Amino acid sequence: MTRSIDLAVVAGDGIGPEVVAEGLKVLDAALAGTDVTVRTTAYDLGAARWHATGETLTDEDLAALAQHDAILLGAIGDPGVPSGVLERGLLLKLRFAFDHYVNLRPSRLYPGVATPLAKGGDVDFVVVREGTEGPYVGNGGAIRVGTPHEIANEVSVNTAFGVERVVRDAFARADARPRKKLTLVHKHNVLVHAGHLWRRTVEAVGAEFPDVAVDYLHVDAATIFLVTDPARFDVVVTDNLFGDILTDLAAAITGGIGLAASGNINPDRAFPSMFEPVHGSAPDIAGQGKADPTATVLSVALLLEHLGLTEQAARITAAVESDIVERGSAVRSTAEVGDALAARVAG
């Protein structure tokens, strides 16, 4: 029986449309010859729309997006939009509305990829970052703004419900991986209230996963080990803020954000999950065919894996690995990279 994937496509700004086009090209190649088809719907969201209409993400947009199986996002933003407008009005609004409580960031050092590490080693881990709590919920404020007595605060929200569900997701992922190891990263010696909630939750849920080895690192120690011994990590679970910082460091040691894919996941599947490259819109090279679409292609692999199409996802990942090994220092256009990856996936 034929299966159809109803995919929302938000190409966005800058290089977004270019890399998304190549991601869709590889997606089509991965599904060719299968009983799975893709139906795409494009959405005009991002800086261009904000400049034209002042809108970021309307209730009508959310209602329409909610009907899809998944969302593929390119990149959002340009220098002409004030900081925070699109981040909060579009990306975070979408994350909270669709309860994307797992932010998934795989970090793998592919053979042939340049790294600042003296010794690369077998680096292959995933960060499971809580996505809907912490200090990003907007629970804070400021008074006496602009005076010498200004007071500003941001309150980090951590609920037992929210922490348990992301910890449970992380344990399930660790249990499904060969190494079966989970590392909690926090700072419970100083952030005693939230930190110990996370610690107790990991201990409680961990009892249900006896095959998964568990350890703990303070966040400052974790940054050291990410640079000196990243191969020690398998699955890392952490809160929203620490995860935001650690995942960019993880990208830096595994080839940069140009290779970094991500998924904003609703594991309950009550809403569509969203998949996107980590890099920005890079307006300085937009329209020039210089952008590397590899991170978008790897995001497509995450999308397929989330939808249960693991064989097709693995083919894309294998194609990327082979392409990276063989590309060397060759300079290729965005479309040429996409063509090469699509050809490898098609076999």
Swiss-Prot record:
It is an enzyme of class 1 (oxidoreductase). Homodimer. PANTHER family: D-MALATE DEHYDROGENASE [DECARBOXYLATING]. Mg(2+) binds at residues 220, 244, 248. It comes from the Bacteria. The lineage of its organism: Bacteria, Bacillati, Actinomycetota, Actinomycetes, Micrococcales. It comes from Beutenbergia cavernae (strain ATCC BAA-8 / DSM 12333 / CCUG 43141 / JCM 11478 / NBRC 16432 / NCIMB 13614 / HKI 0122). Binds 1 Mg(2+) or Mn(2+) ion per subunit. Its EC number is 1.1.1.85. GO terms for biological process: L-leucine biosynthetic process. This is 3-isopropylmalate dehydrogenase. GO terms for molecular function: 3-isopropylmalate dehydrogenase activity; magnesium ion binding; NAD binding. Pathway: Amino-acid biosynthesis; L-leucine biosynthesis; L-leucine from 3-methyl-2-oxobutanoate: step 3/4. Keywords: Amino-acid biosynthesis, Branched-chain amino acid biosynthesis, Cytoplasm, Leucine biosynthesis, Magnesium, Manganese, Metal-binding, NAD, Oxidoreductase. SMART domains: Iso_dh. Catalyzes the oxidation of 3-carboxy-2-hydroxy-4-methylpentanoate (3-isopropylmalate) to 3-carboxy-4-methyl-2-oxopentanoate. The product decarboxylates to 4-methyl-2 oxopentanoate. The record marks 136, 187 as: Important for catalysis. NAD(+) binds at residues 280-292. It catalyses: (2R,3S)-3-isopropylmalate + NAD(+) = 4-methyl-2-oxopentanoate + CO2 + NADH. Belongs to the isocitrate and isopropylmalate dehydrogenases family. LeuB type 2 subfamily.
